[in-house]
Curated annotation (Swiss-Prot):
The modification Leucine amide is found at residue 69. Insect active toxin causing rapid but reversible paralysis in crickets. No activity shown in mammals. Does not show effect on mammalian voltage-gated calcium channels. It holds the Pfam family Toxin_7. The keyword Secreted applies. Disulfide bonds join 37-53, 44-58, 52-68. Its main location: secreted. It comes from Agelena orientalis. This is U2-agatoxin-Ao1f. The keyword Cell inner membrane does not apply. Residues 1-20 form the signal peptide.
Length: 70
């Protein structure tokens, strides 16, 4: 009986994870909306990852300083 209940709970969790994936794709924000674009001072924002707005590459100069370089 416990095995059946465990199997049911595991399959319900897997199903809920599969259902959540398509919804997340629709919730992705552009770099401007999430604050990842800082073209005026050419600094990389931590939220934008290794990308910069003007298609420059983000170079980490130190732990506290990352700049967008060509």
């Amino acid at each position: 009986m416990r095995a059946i209940i465990s199997l049911f709970l595991i399959s319900a969790m897997v199903f809920s994870m599969i259902q959540a994936v398509p919804e997340e794709k629709g919730l992705q924000l552009s770099e401007d909306e999430r604050g990842g674009c800082l073209p005026h001072n050419r600094f990389c924002n931590a939220l934008s990852g290794p990308r910069c707005c003007s298609r420059l590459k983000c170079k980490e100069l130190s732990i506290w300083d990352s700049r967008c370089l060509g």
